[in-house]
Amino acid sequence: MANSKSAKKRALQSEKRRQHNASRRSMLRTYVKKVIAAIKAGDHKTAAEAFAVAQPIVDRMATKGLIHKNKAARQKARLNAKIKAIAA
């Protein structure tokens, strides 16, 4: 347990950030899951619409440091490739 005043403050800040990041990470996963569900259903239009909504959120989370920028790029590329495969 934190002994000094500054250590207590850091512990409180850390917990606050952890909860905030967990909420954001959950939101990100939800949007990505919507795209994946539409892809599995084989619905190109719905998948494309869900991807259009999820894409800026993935980018924003990478900018904020919640996920790595390479992970964001990889996630978007893979989802987009799967959506294009449905159309073909």
UniProtKB/Swiss-Prot annotation:
- Pfam families per the record? Ribosomal_S20p (PF01649)
Region annotation (Disordered) ranges: 1-27
Q: Which UniProt keywords apply?
A: Ribonucleoprotein, Ribosomal protein, RNA-binding, rRNA-binding
- Is the Cytoplasm keyword given for this protein? no
Q: Which GO terms describe its biological process?
A: translation
Q: Which residues form a coiled coil?
A: none
The UniProt entry's GO CC annotations, sorted and at most eight, read:
cytosol; small ribosomal subunit
Q: Which InterPro entries match?
A: Ribosomal_bS20, Ribosomal_bS20_sf
Annotated GO molecular function terms are: small ribosomal subunit rRNA binding; structural constituent of ribosome
Q: Does the keyword Ribonucleoprotein apply?
A: yes
Similarity section: Belongs to the bacterial ribosomal protein bS20 family.
Question: In UniProt terms, what function does this protein have?
Answer: Binds directly to 16S ribosomal RNA.
Q: What is this protein called?
A: Small ribosomal subunit protein bS20
> Which organism is this protein's natural source?
Shewanella baltica (strain OS155 / ATCC BAA-1091)
Gene expressing this chain: rpsT
